[in-house]
Design a protein with these regions (language model features):
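Conserved alpha/beta enzyme-core scaffold
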Residues: 1-498
C-alpha cells in the first residue's frame, strides 16, 4: 500500500472537537510535536470564532512544550492522563481548567484498553521509519504506542528525520493479553527480549505521514551540588553496606532510578563506588548519566521505556549503535513499569519525595496537599514491588523554611507499607521491620534537619503514646498550616494544641 504524505496542518485538521487522541512518547522523548503544534492553531482559531474546541489526550507520560505546553496555552485540552511536567499544563490543572487523571504509568495502556477513558479516535505516533505494509519503528520511547495504534480508528505518523534509522531494532514491542487470557510477562532478566522491534498496524489505518525534522525537547538538569552529592553518597553507602551484610546478593540487583538532579547524583555515586559491581537497570527512563555509566562499563545493560537524554547524547547513541545495540532496550510503559516484572527481577527502586512523614508515608505529587506538581509517574509501580524501595529528598527547602519531614504528609501517594528506606543529606532511615514508633525515631534521628529535630520530638509529646501510630489529630498538619500562615514551618507553636 502506498504511503500518504501530508502536511502537519492537514493532519491536524483531521482532529475534531471532542476527540480523544493517543500519543506516542514517554517524557519529551519520542512524542508528537508537529501535528500538536498545528492543532493548537486550530483551537485558537475556533475559540476566536466563539466555537468550542477541546480534546482528550492519552499519553505514556509527559510530553514536550510543543504538545502539553502549546495545547494548554491554547486551552485545547479537556482531559489528560497520565503524568506531565509542563508548567503551563500544571497551572491549568491547578486552576481547574483541565481534568487530569494522575494514574500509575504501568496502568495507563490497560485502562485505555479496558475502555475506562473512552474511545481513541486518532493516534499520533513519532517514528524513525514506517513501511508500506504497516510496520512502525518508534523513535526514542515506547510509551503506550502499541495500544493506541491498535485501538485508534486512524493513525498519523510523524516521520522524524531527527531520529536516525539506527534506532530501528532498539525497541522490544510487546502487548499483553487482557484478562481473563493474560499470561505471565516472560522477562527473567533486564536484557530479555520478548516482542518485535516495530508496531504492526493495518496500513489502511495510516491516514497520513508527516515528515519532520524536530529534535526531542529534552530538558537538561543542573550540575550536582554538595547537597545532592551527599544524598547520592548516602544511597551508595547504604546499598554497599546492605550488599556486605548479604541482604543484597554479591552480584547486585537491577536498579530503577527516577528523573532529575538527585537521581543523577545517586547514579554518579553508585558508578564511583567500586565495591558495587557493574549492575543492570530495569527502569522507566534512561538519562545522560546512565549512558555515561554504560560507556564506562559500570552499567552492563539498560532496559527502559525512553531515552530521555540531551540531543547531543542521543545523537551519540545513534552514532555508536554498534556499541549500544546489545546494551539497551526500549519497551512499552506497561512492560518497563510492570509490577510483575519488577518483583520478579528484585529491582531496587530509588525515587524522589516531596515530603515524608514520621511513619514513612510519602507525598510525591502535591504541594501543600492540593496543588499538583507533576504526578505519581512510575514511582508507585516500582515502590510497592521493589526488593528495596528508597525515597530521597533534601531535608529542608526554601532556605530552611520547609521541612521535608513532617508529622503527617499533606497528600498520600506511597504508604508506610511500601516504603523501606528514606534518605536525606542528613543520613539514612532504615524502616524495614520496624513498628511505627520505631520508624518515627529512626527518621527523626537520621533524616531530619537539625533545625527541626526538637520540633518533631515535641510533636510526638503531644500524643498520649497509647496507640499503634501516634498522631495528634488537631496538630498533625499544623506545620503545613504554619507555612501557609507565616511562611516558615519553624514558627509552629505546639502549645496551641495541648
Amino acid at each position: 500500500m502506498a504511503l500518504n504524505y501530508i502536511s502537519a496542518a492537514e493532519a491536524a485538521s483531521l482532529i475534531k472537537h471532542g476527540y480523544n487522541i493517543g500519543l506516542s512518547g514517554f517524557t519529551p522523548a519520542g512524542t508528537a510535536k508537529a501535528v500538536t503544534a498545528e492543532l493548537a492553531k486550530i483551537a485558537e482559531a475556533e475559540h476566536a470564532k466563539g466555537n468550542p474546541f477541546q480534546i482528550g489526550i492519552f499519553t505514556g507520560a509527559s510530553t514536550g512544550d510543543s504538545c502539553d505546553g502549546i495545547l494548554s496555552r491554547a486551552k485545547a485540552i479537556r482531559y489528560r492522563a497520565p503524568y506531565t511536567t509542563n508548567s503551563d499544563f500544571r497551572k491549568a490543572v491547578n486552576n481547574g481548567e483541565i481534568a487530569y487523571n494522575d494514574i500509575h504509568l504501568s496502568q495507563m495502556a490497560q485502562e485505555v484498553r479496558y475502555g475506562f477513558m473512552g474511545k481513541v479516535n486518532i493516534a499520533i505516533i513519532e517514528a524513525c521509519e514506517v513501511t508500506p505494509d504497516g510496520k512502525i519503528y518508534l523513535s526514542a520511547a515506547g510509551g503506550i504506542a502499541p495500544t493506541v495504534c491498535r485501538l485508534a480508528d486512524q493513525i498519523i505518523v510523524e516521520l522524524n528525520a531527527a531520529h536516525s534509522k539506527n534506532a530501528m531494532g532498539l525497541h522490544d514491542v510487546y502487548e499483553p493479553l487482557d484478562p481473563p487470557y493474560r499470561r505471565e510477562i516472560p522477562i527473567y532478566k533486564p536484557s530479555d527480549r520478548i516482542g518485535q522491534p516495530y508496531i504492526q498496524v493495518d496500513p489502511k489505518k495510516i491516514v497520513g505521514i508527516v515528515e519532520t525534522n524536530w529534535p526531542d525537547e529534552a530538558r537538561s538538569f543542573a550540575d550536582a551540588d554538595p547537597l545532592t552529592d551527599k544524598i547520592g553518597q548516602n544511597v551508595a553507602d547504604f546499598l554497599a553496606a546492605d550488599m556486605k551484610r548479604g541482604i543484597i546478593p554479591s552480584t547486585f540487583l537491577p536498579l530503577q532510578s527516577g528523573v532529575g538532579n538527585i537521581a543523577n547524583a545517586v547514579l554518579g555515586a553508585l558508578g564511583r563506588d567500586k565495591t558495587i559491581p557493574a549492575f543492570e537497570m530495569y527502569t522507566e527512563v534512561i538519562q545522560n548519566s546512565v549512558i555515561g555509566l554504560i560507556r564506562d562499563g559500570r552499567v552492563k545493560f539498560g532496559s527502559a521505556c525512553s531515552l530521555t537524554v540531551t540531543n547531543d547524547c542521543l545523537q551519540g547513541i545513534y552514532d555508536d549503535m554498534d556499541f549500544f545495540r546489545d546494551k539497551l532496550v526500549l519497551r512499552p510503559s506497561e512492560i518497563s513499569n510492570s509490577p510483575e516484572v519488577v518483583r520478579r527481577l528484585g529491582v531496587i527502586s530509588i525515587n524522589t519525595a516531596i515530603e515524608a512523614d514520621l511513619y514513612g508515608n510519602v507525598n510525591s505529587t502535591h504541594i501543600g496537599g492540593t496543588k499538583m506538581m507533576n504526578g505519581i509517574g512510575g514511582s508507585g509501580d516500582f515502590t510497592r514491588n521493589a526488593y528495596i524501595s528508597i525515597f530521597t529528598c533534601p531535608s529542608v527547602a526554601k532556605e530552611g523554611k520547609i521541612s521535608a519531614i513532617v508529622p503527617m504528609v499533606s497528600h498520600h501517594d506511597h504508604t508506610e507499607h511500601d516504603v523501606n528506606i528514606i534518605i536525606t543529606e542528613q543520613g539514612v532511615a532504615d524502616l524495614r521491620g520496624k513498628s511505627p514508633k520505631e520508624r518515627a525515631q529512626a527518621i527523626i534521628e537520621n533524616c531530619v534537619h537539625p533545625d527541626y529535630k526538637n520540633i518533631l520530638w515535641d510533636y510526638l509529646k503531644l500524643t498520649d503514646g497509647k496507640s499503634q501510630t501516634p498522631q495528634a489529630a488537631r496538630a498533625a498538619l499544623a506545620m503545613h498550616a504554619e507555612l501557609a500562615k507565616s511562611g516558615n514551618m519553624q514558627n509552629v507553636d505546639w502549645a496551641q494544641y495541648k
